[in-house]
């Protein structure tokens, strides 16, 4: 009598042998994945360039575009693309934020979008979506935005932002900043929140070094790095409120300061850390600010656009540019110093978030549930 197990194995081997090698390999191959996808926008031509990297070189993808951050109800724009990029121009008169869906053959779709919002009067207004976390999830697009001052947003900008649906705006600026450059939010109903001035101003410490005798650019950069951790502590009440609103599901939410790189950058770094985004990605997001904004031109003017005498930043234009340069940077060293200080004093950045910002484990779970996919 034949052993039934041996007979079964023989049948399986025979069946496999009946298949061609190509068919077997096709059946066993894993579907391609999108390892990375990015979008850039040429504002002059209103042309988007979508680029991607697949897990299998040469894998074909389909592209579609949606007005929803989750990519739902997307409209196909191209199929079976074997290249790694595609350019697309919307029809004339079609405005609003766009999210692109990249779908590999038999694989899972990936949503991507421009990180910097194309606003006429925006300063560093950008989406925190698309970042991968250490546990394999992704920060959802269109839910949290970071920005600089919003006082120059145009009617067209507000029309664009109306489609984003922001429900809460947390303004980290001091009272004098808000009075000088007021935000007049008009992109739909939103809860605009401002905060009492901190007991001390970390920015004052950065500026004082400029007036020291024999000051050098290196001294200014060192002072910037040394004083940077104070931002997290002085802005703790504001950051705590931001986390509370996120935990309550009040999204989409935007937060801003003046430049959009220091107080907003620290807030973004704390939030991304709480979501489980790797440190190197958090630092890279922080460093993007100087890529998107020419801060020297913004705060001191240029030959084509000189700063007005009544500007609150007019005094900066009178200072040596080489000394101002470190203050205008989003140098990775600055936020890394913050992380190192918080780790030395609290054991970890997460301990700071939990103890000083008062974010509970239940709130963290709620925030992650809302903002990750």
Where are the language model's segments positioned?
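Compact beta-sheet-dominated domain cores in extracellular/mature segments
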Residues: 9-13
């Amino acid at each position: 009598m034949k052993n039934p197990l041996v007979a079964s194995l023989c049948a399986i081997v025979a069946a496999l042998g009946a298949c061609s090698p190509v068919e077997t390999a096709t059946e066993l191959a894993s579907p391609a994945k999108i390892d990375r996808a990015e979008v850039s926008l040429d504002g002059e031509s209103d042309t988007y360039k979508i680029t991607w990297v697949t897990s299998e070189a040469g894998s074909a993808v389909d592209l579609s575009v949606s007005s929803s951050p989750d990519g739902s109800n997307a409209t196909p724009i191209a199929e079976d693309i074997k290249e790694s990029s595609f350019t697309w121009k919307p029809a004339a008169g079609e405005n609003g934020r766009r999210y692109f869906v990249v779908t590999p053959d038999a694989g899972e779709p990936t949503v991507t979008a421009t990180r910097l919002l194309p606003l006429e009067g925006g300063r560093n207004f950008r989406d925190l979506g698309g970042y991968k976390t250490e546990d394999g999830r992704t920060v959802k697009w269109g839910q949290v935005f970071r920005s600089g001052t919003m006082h120059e947003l145009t009617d067209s900008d507000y029309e664009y932002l109306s489609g984003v649906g922001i429900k809460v705006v947390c303004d980290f600026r001091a009272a004098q900043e808000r009075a000088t450059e007021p935000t007049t939010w008009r992109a739909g109903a939103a809860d605009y929140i401002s905060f009492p001035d901190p007991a001390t101003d970390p920015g004052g410490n950065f500026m004082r070094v400029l007036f020291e005798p024999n000051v050098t650019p290196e001294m200014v950069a060192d002072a910037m790095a040394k004083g940077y951790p104070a931002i997290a502590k002085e802005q703790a009440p504001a950051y705590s409120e931001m986390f509370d609103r996120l935990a309550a599901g009040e999204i989409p939410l935007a937060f801003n300061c003046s430049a959009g790189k220091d107080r907003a950058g620290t807030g973004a770094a704390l939030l991304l850390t709480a979501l489980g985004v790797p440190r190197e990605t958090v630092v890279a997001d922080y460093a993007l600010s100087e890529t998107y904004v020419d801060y020297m031109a913004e705060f001191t003017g240029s030959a084509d656009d000189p700063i007005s005498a009544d500007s609150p930043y007019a005094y900066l234009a009178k200072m040596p540019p080489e000394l101002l340069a470190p203050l205008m940077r989003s140098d990775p060293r600055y936020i890394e110093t913050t992380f190192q200080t918080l780790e030395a004093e609290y054991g970890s950045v997460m301990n700071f978030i939990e103890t000083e910002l008062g974010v509970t484990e239940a709130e963290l779970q709620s925030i992650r549930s809302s903002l990750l996919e």
